[in-house]
From Swiss-Prot:
Pathway(s) served: Quinol/quinone metabolism; menaquinone biosynthesis; menaquinol from 1,4-dihydroxy-2-naphthoate: step 2/2; Cofactor biosynthesis; ubiquinone biosynthesis
Name of the gene: ubiE
Reaction(s) this enzyme catalyzes, per UniProt: a 2-demethylmenaquinol + S-adenosyl-L-methionine = a menaquinol + S-adenosyl-L-homocysteine + H(+); a 2-methoxy-6-(all-trans-polyprenyl)benzene-1,4-diol + S-adenosyl-L-methionine = a 5-methoxy-2-methyl-3-(all-trans-polyprenyl)benzene-1,4-diol + S-adenosyl-L-homocysteine + H(+)
Membrane-spanning residues: none
Free-text function comment from the UniProt entry: Methyltransferase required for the conversion of demethylmenaquinol (DMKH2) to menaquinol (MKH2) and the conversion of 2-polyprenyl-6-methoxy-1,4-benzoquinol (DDMQH2) to 2-polyprenyl-3-methyl-6-methoxy-1,4-benzoquinol (DMQH2).
GO MF annotations, alphabetized: 2-methoxy-6-polyprenyl-1,4-benzoquinol methyltransferase activity; demethylmenaquinone methyltransferase activity
A Pfam match: Ubie_methyltran
Highest taxon of the lineage: Bacteria
The name this protein goes by in its record: Ubiquinone/menaquinone biosynthesis C-methyltransferase UbiE
Organism: Syntrophotalea carbinolica (strain DSM 2380 / NBRC 103641 / GraBd1)
Length: 237
């Protein structure tokens, strides 16, 4: 594990630093596939009609904007701990015409009343949360009974060949490009944070312990990314 990353470290300063080039590097380093991953998660929300959707760790607002476009009657609340990320999001969200609200807060302490969201999503953010179980419990608290949670996160590919290629890319290529354009430390942190994240079955267990039912996962792009889903338990479950 490199000297730039320590388990339990507050990553807010890191994300504040990379905010100006965050979108550019996402497109470049993923070869544009990150957009498809986010859209897959947004489609999975399957919101019927109006509703309030929490976009946790909203970053520069890509997911929030996709939700507003896909569900014209939805209200979106985007929450992020990094103020610089939120500042970068503001001009991008103008097409949503006021249907997206941005709040600076942590996932472990959401500034939302209980049972006020119809669905919640967090894309590429849960691995950076210091207290993941607490965050999952917060998602459960703010969701209405039966409300859906979607978690999109990097994973370890299950195919040994792909896993080796991905590890080589994430360990050696990605940090060099990231260092040239933005902050090398941030992109050295990325592979360490992915490897430190719980295995698929373990994370599904954490969701169940936090009050979610019907939990499942679906691998995307050979398991480089995994989409987790679950529904907040109903009374009597």
């Amino acid at each position: 594990m490199n000297k730039d990353y320590r388990p339990g470290q507050d990553t807010r300063p890191l994300f504040d630093r990379i905010a100006p080039r965050y979108d550019l590097l996402n497109r470049l380093l993923s070869f544009g596939i990150d957009r498809r991953w986010r859209l897959a998660a947004v489609r999975e929300l399957a919101l019927a009609g109006a509703g309030r959707i929490l976009d946790a760790a909203t970053g520069t607002g890509d997911v929030a904007l996709s939700i507003a476009a896909a569900y014209p009657r939805a209200e979106v609340v985007g929450v992020d701990l990094s103020m610089n990320m939120l500042r970068a999001a503001v001009p991008k969200l103008l097409p949503a015409e006021g249907r997206i609200t941005l709040l600076q807060a942590s996932c472990e302490s959401l500034p939302l009343a209980a049972e006020t969201c119809d669905a919640a999503i967090i894309a590429f953010g849960i691995r950076n949360v210091l207290q993941r179980q607490v965050a999952l419990q917060e998602f459960s608290r703010v969701l209405k009974p039966g409300g859906r949670l979607l978690v999109l996160e990097f994973s370890q590919p299950t195919n040994p060949l792909l896993a080796g290629l991905y590890r080589c890319y994430s360990r050696h290529v990605l940090p060099r490009i990231g260092g040239l354009i933005s902050d090398g430390a941030a992109y050295r942190y990325l592979p360490d944070s992915v490897e430190a994240f719980p295995a698929r079955g373990e994370f599904l267990g954490m969701m169940e312990q936090s009050g979610f039912r019907h939990v499942r996962h679906r691998d995307l792009t050979g398991g480089i990314v995994t989409l987790y889903s679950g529904c907040r338990s109903l009374p009597g479950d």
